Regions:
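Divalent metal-coordination and catalytic microenvironments
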Residues: 49, 56, 73
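Histidine-centered divalent metal-coordination motifs
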Residues: 18, 51-52
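Alpha-helical residues within the helix-turn-helix
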Residues: 40, 57-58
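N-terminal helix-turn-helix DNA-binding core of bacterial DNA-binding proteins
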Residues: 4-5, 9-45, 67-79
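Conserved catalytic-core motifs of GNAT/GCN5-like acyltransferases
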Residues: 65-67, 97
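Short coil turns linking two alpha-helices in DNA-binding domains
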Residues: 45-46, 52
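Amphipathic alpha-helical dimerization/coiled-coil segments
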Residues: 1-5, 26-27, 77-110
Length: 110
């Protein structure tokens, strides 16, 4: 993955509803979910969901599969793993990120 693709993927996920949709699709596995079911589970209007799915699809993070009258969406696990690999290689020097990096310390103010 190159930096342009990584930025595009991260930008697509940098919005609450889109991140929730992506998390739901990852949890649903390779079969994915119908658009109506995604909207119902997350309480998102169909028109809003359509906008978010378009953004995630353009970033390559989701795939759509038409079946009969419905569109089924699934996470693109290859793209997700490529993004995780890019972050690990380029942000953590190829090593697992240290636990200290994931914690925050409280600052003392004078």
């Amino acid at each position: 993955m190159d930096i342009t693709t990584a930025v595009k993927s991260l930008a697509a996920l940098a919005q609450d509803s889109r991140l929730e949709v992506f998390r739901l699709l990852v949890q649903a596995g390779p079969d994915g979910l119908a658009a109506g079911e995604i909207a119902e589970r997350l309480g998102i209007p169909a028109s809003t969901l359509s906008f978010h799915m378009k953004t995630l699809s353009h970033a390559g993070l989701v795939e759509v599969r038409p079946e009969s009258r419905f569109n089924y969406y699934s996470a693109n696990f290859e793209a997700m793993n490529a993004l995780l690999g890019y972050l690990t290689d380029n942000c953590c020097g190829g090593r697992a990120c240290a636990p200290a990096a994931a914690t925050t310390r409280k600052r003392k103010f004078s």
